[in-house]
Regions:
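Alpha-helical transmembrane segments and their immediate juxtamembrane cytosolic regions
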Residues: 1-350
Length: 350
């Protein structure tokens, strides 16, 4: 069964992603030194972890569904690995599109590490771990252990000189280099692995009552993990070199707890709202929206307004851009319908 509140939560990540990118690309530099912009960026910082977390959930749910339809665990794991490699391949196609539109050094443009690169490799790791388990709870333990391990070794990976000998394009995947990418496997893969663990629990909830009880437990667990992460941030660091906002496991677990808590929040909201959900529709178009909006926000198409809008103007542009992207997503759906059925269907987008 398709869980609408997961689509809704993905749609929220889409809206937050657009906010983060438009404000970052279009706001004047001297308009960024206030609490409104600062809080907007903190909220925007949850988009990428949200996408990774939800991708892990989707992987686990898809695997469980295939097993129930009679496919062997070996075939299911192979399909999950294949999908991860497709996402990894799409990352390079996305970078190629960016270079064709905006230019620049072709090698650096194609090899720059973006979230799709990290998502693809993280999905591959989750698929391999899923294949190691013989039962659902074995797999959940693998995911939980890997989540904690990736988070805890992140400060060590960032600081160790042992990785200096790696070829630059490989090193960009394990620690960030300015201009070569923001996303790295450490700690970002842990969000997807944590999502896969949550997805395995969700997959076990096969009745409405079971899913309701599970979301209550998710609320308790999310609050506990977030509170523990926040409390641990006040303790002396156990690492020689770490930064709270980038490599700290305490910040990771704070965010992971909030992401887990977002599941019951989305579940409760969607239980109350029974009408059409624009947010769910946005969520189902997340890859398409990501694909087209990044180049519009940062590329040559909007060059004249890069870092030139006041904060109020940037928020207005963000709202208009979001509406336009939703319209583009519905237009894409119309084109797909026309392609599949031979006639254009009304979408009711606006």
């Amino acid at each position: 069964m398709r869980r609408g509140y997961i689509d809704w939560l993905r749609g929220m990540s889409v809206v937050i992603m657009i906010e983060a990118h438009t404000l970052d690309a279009w706001t004047q530099l001297d308009a960024r030194h206030n609490s409104t912009y600062g809080w907007a960026m903190i909220v925007g910082g949850f988009a990428a972890p949200g996408f990774m977390f939800l991708a892990g959930i989707a992987l686990a749910l898809a695997a469980g569904s295939r097993v129930r339809r009679g496919q062997s665990p070996e075939d299911v794991a192979a399909l999950a690995r294949r999908r991860s490699l497709q996402i990894f391949g799409l990352a390079f196609l996305f970078r190629l599109q960016s270079w064709v539109i905006s230019g620049g050094d072709p090698v650096q443009a194609l090899l720059k590490v973006d979230i799709l690169n990290i998502m693809g490799l993280s999905m591959l790791a989750a698929a391999l771990l899923w294949g190691l388990g013989r039962a659902r709870w074995d797999r959940a333990l693998w995911m939980i252990a890997a989540t904690a391990a990736v988070a805890m070794v992140t400060p060590i990976v960032r600081a160790t000189p042992l990785l200096n000998a790696l070829p630059d394009p490989v090193e960009w995947y394990v620690r960030p280099i300015p201009g070569r990418g923001t996303f790295t496997l450490f700690p970002w893969a842990a969000f997807l692995l944590g999502g896969a663990g949550a997805g395995l629990w969700l997959d076990a909830a096969r009745t409405p009552d079971a899913e309701r009880r599970l979301n209550v437990w998710f609320a308790v667990l999310g609050i506990a993990i977030a509170a523990a992460g926040y409390a641990a941030s006040f303790l002396p660091p156990i690492y020689r070199e770490t930064s709270f906002w980038t490599t700290s496991p305490t910040f990771f677990f704070l965010r992971l707890g909030i992401l887990i808590l977002s599941l019951p929040v989305a579940y409760a909201w969607n239980a109350l709202w029974t009408g059409r959900s624009v947010m769910q529709e946005f969520g189902r178009a997340s890859l398409f929206v990501y694909w087209i909006h990044v180049e519009i926000a940062y590329g040559v198409l909007t060059g004249p307004i890069h870092k030139s809008l006041t904060l109020g103007q940037a928020f207005t542009a963000y709202a208009l851009f979001t509406i336009a992207l939703f319209g583009a997503a519905k237009l894409k759906d119309q084109i797909v319908d026309w392609w599949n059925t031979g006639r254009l269907q009304p979408s009711g987008a606006l």
